[in-house]
Amino acid sequence: MTRVARHLTLKTSMACLSLSLALFCGAGSAEQDSPLGSLQSGIVTSPEEQAMGREFIAAARKQLVFIDDPLLTEYVSALGQRLSRGLVGDTDSLRFFLINSPMVNAFAGPGSRMAVFTGLVTATQTEAELASVIAHELGHVAQRHLPRMMERSRQRKLPTTAAMLAGILLGGQVGAAAMAATSGAAVADQLNYNREYEREADVLGLRILTDAGYPASATIQFLKRLDQETRLQSSGAPEYLRTHPLTQNRIALVESRIRQYPDFAEPPSLDFYHARVRIQALYGAGGADSVLANFTHHLDSTVTIDARAARYGQVLTLIRFGNYDEAIKLASDLHRDFPEDVSYRLVLADALLQSGQVEDAVSHLETLALETPESTVVAYYFADALMKAGRFEVSRKVLRRTIRAAPSNAFLYRLMARVEGEAGNLPQSFQALAEFYFLQDEVSRAIGALQHASTLVSDNAYLEASITSKISELEALQPSKP
């Protein structure tokens, strides 16, 4: 396939995905609607919806690049969990993903799967603005817009929803053909309901946002800035406004609702600033000089938190491009100036580790782990350093203890797979890898890893039985084939 053809295929696939997500977030209902802004619907995720969610994410992984950085994924998940605390129902089923894309977008997919694009994080100016978008998506989930849309489609015998989902699942040119075959009157019919669902998600999103301690005004600040930037650009609306249409009526409704909430100044969030610069440093386009330039003009900022974050971004960029000596120097300066900040201690340890100073990194992280026993991220970095130092048994113990406290953290299992593999325990390595795949909604790959693990087991009846049982459990989750 030529470069041009690949580019067109990607653009077509993304168009399919964007249109489908717009439909997911807006359509009619055959269920009884909850009162506007009510939390009574709550989070309800049936086994069928969970299965669809797994299929959806597995298919999305073929079209999009998912971020696997433990610090960034923990930040997005923690923000989502903070916002969902005021909701009722099965909030444990909520899953948050971070996608590496410059598009300003976020979506709520089936099975309470929610995705945030890195372009959205870097486009927002405060954590409250980012939280306002996630709160809006939680509003879609709490009001069960996707299940209501699908039920209405079934009752009206409209194949659009299933075909649009198939367009995502098939992907590429085949998916585009499936989308095109059903994107006529049925799509227009369902989009007529988008406005009502956006209204519900706006109203409920404001409640979710303010219940989590954020100012409601952040919602309109972000929407108006996006709208203004759209008018000044010739490239069209950001993806978020294409999937969440912004009309004057919608702006007026949000503004009228905001007046019901007390306004206050949001204290700046260092975690948010760190997340933004981490995205720019680790995933920004261009060479070292180009990426470093993103932070240079912030170093003399009168906003202390902005200057701090810029220094952090510099260190991350230097590590990314292999300038470890300079990274260690700047990270040490940051740690000296702000000794209480865990992020700076982690980035110093990372610079030491990448430069080959493994024992220094282990010593540094061991001290930090003792001071922050509840931190999953610190435990992850400590276990990783122990593995690279060849201390596999200690690394395994750290991971086992951390997994007991955070059993749904996929990256712990991925690291455990590496530790077991380095230690020569191949069946256990593939067993841990299967858990990682499962938590990433890649059930087929999880089954494959377990099947491979079963071929490596010898003289261990308990382990073999455990693997066989898990294979059966996962096979039961697979969609039945016609």
PLM feature spans:
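Membrane-active amphipathic alpha-helices enriched in small hydrophobic residues
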Residues: 158-173, 177-188
